[in-house]
Amino acid sequence: PLSGVYLSYEMLQSMDQVTAAVEALEDGSAVMLDLKSIYGSYYYTSSLEGASAPQDWDTQAVDALITELRRKSCYLIARLPAFSDNAFALAHQSEGLPLSNGALWMDAEGSYWLNPASETVQTHLKDLCSELQRKGFREIVFYNFYFPESANISYSSDLSRREVATAA
């Protein structure tokens, strides 16, 4: 039988709820954790440049949870957004998806998106994956991992949409 649990951002806000879920797990179970928001906040202690936690967030509790899950030999899976990241987009505006007026494109959730074809963005994601691997995560599930469709996005004039999509 398969055994596992998904610890969402909402669950991570209540460590009592998380503790109950983890105690019920058999050793070696799969556990997927939300570890970053679309706004660029990290839910664990990250050493990446510009990484910060949400206000009033206990990253040490999440770090301790990861340690406990590793002690139980759990199969750790990280879940995080790939290209929607306000903090990175604002810190590296040239790596965001621009509108024709130069402002950054924002999705319906109020999140700025990064250019999936950008080498800087791809390196950032690789660094994030490497950090999570060092913390014991065996898989990473990216969401918001696509080129957004919007007539308002002004892709570089020297690249067509097809070329941009092929580059990623």
Task: Explain the meaning of each model-derived region.
Residues 2-12, 83-130:
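Active-site-adjacent "subsite" loops/lids of carbohydrate-active enzymes
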Residues 39-81, 149-168:
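Aromatic-lined substrate-binding rim segments of carbohydrate-active enzymes
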Residues 17-42, 131-142:
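Catalytic domains of carbohydrate-active enzymes, especially glycoside hydrolases
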Residues 8-17, 38-39, 55-56, 85:
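Acidic-and-aromatic substrate-binding clefts and catalytic sites of carbohydrate-active enzymes
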Residues 18-24, 61-65, 128, 167-168:
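A general structural detector for well-ordered alpha-helical segments in enzyme core domains, enriched
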Residues 107-168:
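Polysaccharide-binding and catalytic clefts of secreted carbohydrate-active enzymes
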Residues 30-35, 58-106:
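Glycine-rich, aromatic-flanked loop segments that form ligand/cofactor-binding clefts
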Residues 2-6, 30-32, 73-77, 138-141:
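Structural preference for beta-strand elements that scaffold enzyme active sites
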